[in-house]
């Protein structure tokens, strides 16, 4: 498979991670380098590993992955988005695992939800007998870079707005809408 095709696939797979990173940045107007690294690293890692898992699974689980992946993504994103919306109405400003999507279960849920498409791509690479090592690296690096940029972009928009609770609600709604989009595809 030519480099440009792998690059296009990598960018397409990273769009969910980018969009979710923007939503997270909207909810976290103060994003540390450590938080940026955690989110970018985990999104990139999951995006890189899922095609490998899909490739290894081959044809045996193809129909199950295609059937349930949209539902899994929807529930994970709806859960995190719903928590963000709920917490935007709370007056307590303490940062727990849901307010900081770069920690705990929120990070795991978001990482899995953004990378399920990559699992299906790995499955298709297996079916077409394409090698998987270079695409995994390219997909992971692209997701890492676009996640970091998306987080910065969301943070920049949030800083421009003095309505951080509204930004958090918008971020939660965006996550739920992405989940619905994945469900309805």
Swiss-Prot record:
Transmembrane segments: 6-26, 41-61, 65-85, 107-127, 132-152, 164-184
Localization per Swiss-Prot or TrEMBL: Cell inner membrane
Domain of life: Bacteria
A GO cellular-component term linked to this record: plasma membrane
Keywords linked to the UniProt accession: Cell inner membrane, Cell membrane, Ion transport, Manganese, Membrane, Transmembrane, Transmembrane helix, Transport
Main location: membrane
Gene Ontology molecular-function annotations: manganese ion transmembrane transporter activity
Membrane topology summary: Multi-pass membrane protein
Family: Belongs to the MntP (TC 9.B.29) family.
Function: Probably functions as a manganese efflux pump.
Protein name in UniProt: Putative manganese efflux pump MntP
Organism: Maridesulfovibrio salexigens (strain ATCC 14822 / DSM 2638 / NCIMB 8403 / VKM B-1763)
Gene that this polypeptide is encoded by: mntP
């Amino acid at each position: 498979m030519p480099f440009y095709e792998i690059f296009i696939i990598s960018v397409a797979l990273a769009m969910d991670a980018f969009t979710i990173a923007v939503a997270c940045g909207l909810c976290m107007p103060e994003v540390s380098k450590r938080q940026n690294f955690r989110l970018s690293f985990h999104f990139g890692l999951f995006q890189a590993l899922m095609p490998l898992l899909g490739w290894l699974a081959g044809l045996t689980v193809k129909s199950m992955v295609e059937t349930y992946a949209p539902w899994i993504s929807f529930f994970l994103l709806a859960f995190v988005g719903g928590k963000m919306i709920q917490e935007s109405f709370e007056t307590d400003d303490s940062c727990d695992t849901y307010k900081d999507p770069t920690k705990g279960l929120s990070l795991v849920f978001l990482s899995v939800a953004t990378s399920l498409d990559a699992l299906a791509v790995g499955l298709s690479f297996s079916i077409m007998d394409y090698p998987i090592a270079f695409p995994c690296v390219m997909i992971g690096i692209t997701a890492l870079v676009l996640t970091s940029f998306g987080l910065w972009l969301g943070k920049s928009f949030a800083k421009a707005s003095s309505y951080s609770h509204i930004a958090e609600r918008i971020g939660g709604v965006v996550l739920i809408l992405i989940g619905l989009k994945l469900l309805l595809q």
